[in-house]
């Protein structure tokens, strides 16, 4: 049986609330207190999860080829099985039965866009009400049901005759009828649905969708009013409450009908829809990575975490790809109604890295909102890579770098005015130096990207003319951080990255592996068919003060371990390279599985692992890393485990320090700067907590038995439920005082 004793002495507490302070090299250096009040998103990597597959599609009612190609590049054709097109009420029918040339041309243009995705993709038709509604269809606010039905029938018939491989599976006779488009009332909508169902054989197997409202608060009224002729329940989320949005899809599902969202604007809407039952989602204007990653992983994986903040109109989720085992965390909002909020993602079963930040069990992400409806709104959304293993991103990317291509070892630089080309690396040449920073979370839409700005003149690495095609030219330009100037840095291993453009979802690459000066930089699809082709797309982000070279440091030697009752101290011989940046410590289970990086770029040849479990044996190894992010092979493996002996696990005296006085180095950190006062019970000082709190190491209470002793002077009487300590792993495992 594991037993620990914690002694915490001489605290003066007002209101419990810990600034991280300097600490020795133990696991505690990675502790990062989180701001209270964030919505918790707990997840377990190995949990069974929930499968929530959704049919995904794109919209050509807004007939933009750029929108379609962006969607294809981000989602992938294999994940697109439905498209939304439109019929037009802009012209009367010829002889009450035939479409005009203009109506046919518009259908043809839109269907050709659908053909880019696939020539046999299913189609939903809605009304293109924004193009106009002539009096042939609505006069004095009264819809002509016969004319409306004949138009829809003629449109479907024309598609069947001219594009027979496509199948029209559903019709939305009115689009956003709750808005002032002038389509007609609910009664006329129902009459149109009834007439199509009962008098037009063509519609025997074509679904009718409703309510199709702009405001999801109105959706249930328009949906219920169409019964029994409605098959799919549909709403937009351009206004309305979170609760009504969720309840609408629940109601449709409970009716045995098909929950459907034909105009998604944010991954938040999609996540919430998935929670409450949608089976199909169509993206209106397609943005980028968050939506594409969500479409892919929702159909190839399982959801292992979900949380929502209804007051802020935001939500978050975590998905696992069951084929690749990749983990993605998502955060999203209402396009027009969100308030700024925070989500705290908590990995319950192992320490991980969130977009390179870690190792940690928790990570807090803020998502920006506005002050009111369409005031200060950014339609914010983000996807976060959750990773682990013995080869993780070496550090957080933020600073000035050279971009060295793996194939040629040359670097990307401004070249001949506007071009970006491969040149020999040279110090003190600002044309080949790039400032790489995360984009502002208020940039608009997906903020999962970095900006790459020339240190020479402030221009950005820009995909020319917003190209979505393979071979698109890359240039230096200042488009004010437009979408074709934003890049996803995807870690590829061994210190290299893929750089993927937000607009095109294509990869930055050298056109050739030649070392000749002036080889063009362009974008291309991922190609890993040969190592040579893969290398053209791999980049090392070499810090400004480092050399562009690929020689790895020597393998660390002399690794040994000394166990204490709740930790393992590792020591090894120091490397002697002049450009050494530090060491990487990796740990695996005794059977050689579950390797993870437990320390990165630590500068001294020693480390105390206090995240290990008592009674469990581990393998340890160390790598060296230089300033150019060249990484050595791992050292010889050693085996070690905590002794598990009974006795003192942690002891904090708080003498101007939050350090633990035992060999376990269970150092604490504080949310805000820790204060120390002379009033004390023992020693010389006491810790003063006022609107502050300490975060202790995660394994501090991981024992079958625990004894806690502390001196506390409580000076606050105005607030209830103040805690002296609070340990927990969800609502079913906790202890507090």
Give residue spans per PLM region.
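Substrate-binding cleft and catalytic face of glycoside hydrolase catalytic domains
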Residues: 40-44, 58-220
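Beta-strand-rich modules
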Residues: 609-630
């Amino acid at each position: 049986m594991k037993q620990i004793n914690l002694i915490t002495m001489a605290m003066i507490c007002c209101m419990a609330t810990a600034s991280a302070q300097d600490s020795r090299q133990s696991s505690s250096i990675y502790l990062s207190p989180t701001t209270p009040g964030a919505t918790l998103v707990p997840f377990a990597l190995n949990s069974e999860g929930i499968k929530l597959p959704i049919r995904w599609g794109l919209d050509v009612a807004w007939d933009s080829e750029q929108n379609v190609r962006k969607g294809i590049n981000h989602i992938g054709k294999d994940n697109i099985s439905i498209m939304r097109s439109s019929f037009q009420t802009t012209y009367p029918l010829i002889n009450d039965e035939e479409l005009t040339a203009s109506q046919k041309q518009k259908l043809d243009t839109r269907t050709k866009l659908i053909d880019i995705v696939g020539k046999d993709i299913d189609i939903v038709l809605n009304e293109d009400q924004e193009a106009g509604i002539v009096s042939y269809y609505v006069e004095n606010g009264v819809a002509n049901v016969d004319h409306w039905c004949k138009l829809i029938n003629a449109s479907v018939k024309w598609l069947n005759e001219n594009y027979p491989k496509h199948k029209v599976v559903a019709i939305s006779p009115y689009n956003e009828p709750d808005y002032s488009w002038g389509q007609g009332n609910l009664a006329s909508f129902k009459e149109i649905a009834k007439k199509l169902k009962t008098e037009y054989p063509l519609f025997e197997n074509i679904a009718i969708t409703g309510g199709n409202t702009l405001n999801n608060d109105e959706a249930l009224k328009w949906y219920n009013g169409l019964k029994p002729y409605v098959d799919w329940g549909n709403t937009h989320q351009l206004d309305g409450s979170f609760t009504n949005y969720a309840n609408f899809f629940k109601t449709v599902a409970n009716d045995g009908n098909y929950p459907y969202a034909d105009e998604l604007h944010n991954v938040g809407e999609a996540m919430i829809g998935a929670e409450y039952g949608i089976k199909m989602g169509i993206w209106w204007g397609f943005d980028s990575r968050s939506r594409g990653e969500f479409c892919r992983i929702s159909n190839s994986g399982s959801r292992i975490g979900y949380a929502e903040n209804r007051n802020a109109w935001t939500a978050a989720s975590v998905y696992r790809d069951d084929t690749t085992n990749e983990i993605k965390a998502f955060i999203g909002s209402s396009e027009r109604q969100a308030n700024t909020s925070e989500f705290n993602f908590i990995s319950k079963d192992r320490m991980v890295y969130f977009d390179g930040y870690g190792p940690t069990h928790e990570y807090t992400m803020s998502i920006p909102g506005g002050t009111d409806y369409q005031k200060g709104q950014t339609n914010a959304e983000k996807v976060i890579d959750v990773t682990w293993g013995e080869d993780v991103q070496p550090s957080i990317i933020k600073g000035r770098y050279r971009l060295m291509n793996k194939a040629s070892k040359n670097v990307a630089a401004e070249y001949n005015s506007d071009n970006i080309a491969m040149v020999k690396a040279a110090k003190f040449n600002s044309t080949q130096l790039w400032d790489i920073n995360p984009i502002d979370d208020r940039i608009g839409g997906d903020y999962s990207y970095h900006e790459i700005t020339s240190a020479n003149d402030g221009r950005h690495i820009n995909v020319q003319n917003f190209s979505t095609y393979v071979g698109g030219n890359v240039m230096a330009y200042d488009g004010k951080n437009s979408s074709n100037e934003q890049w996803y840095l995807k870690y590829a291993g061994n210190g290299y990255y893929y750089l993927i453009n937000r607009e095109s979802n294509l990869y930055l690459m050298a056109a050739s592996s030649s070392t000749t000066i002036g080889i063009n930089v362009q974008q291309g699809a991922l190609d890993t068919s040969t190592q040579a082709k893969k290398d053209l797309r791999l980049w090392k982000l070499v810090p400004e003060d480092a050399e562009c070279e690929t020689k790895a440091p020597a393998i660390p030697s002399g690794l040994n371990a000394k166990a204490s009752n709740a930790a393992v101290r590792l020591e090894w011989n120091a490397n002697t390279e002049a450009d050494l940046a530090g060491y990487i410590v990796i740990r695996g289970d005794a059977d050689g599985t579950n390797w993870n990086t437990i320390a990165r770029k630590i500068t001294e040849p020693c480390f105390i692992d206090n995240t290990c479990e008592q009674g469990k044996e581990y393998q340890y190894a160390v790598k060296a890393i230089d300033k150019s992010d060249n990484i050595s092979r791992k050292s010889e493996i050693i085996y070690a485990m905590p002794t598990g002996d009974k006795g003192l696990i942690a002891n904090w005296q708080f003498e101007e320090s939050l350090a633990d006085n035992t060999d376990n180095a269970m150092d604490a950190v504080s949310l805000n700067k820790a204060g120390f006062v002379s009033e004390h019970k023992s020693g010389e000082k006491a810790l003063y907590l006022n609107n502050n709190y300490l975060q202790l190491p995660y394994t501090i209470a991981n024992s079958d038995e625990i004894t806690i002793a502390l001196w506390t002077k409580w000076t606050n009487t105005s607030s209830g439920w103040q805690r002296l300590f609070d340990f927990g792993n969800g609502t079913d495992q906790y202890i507090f005082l």
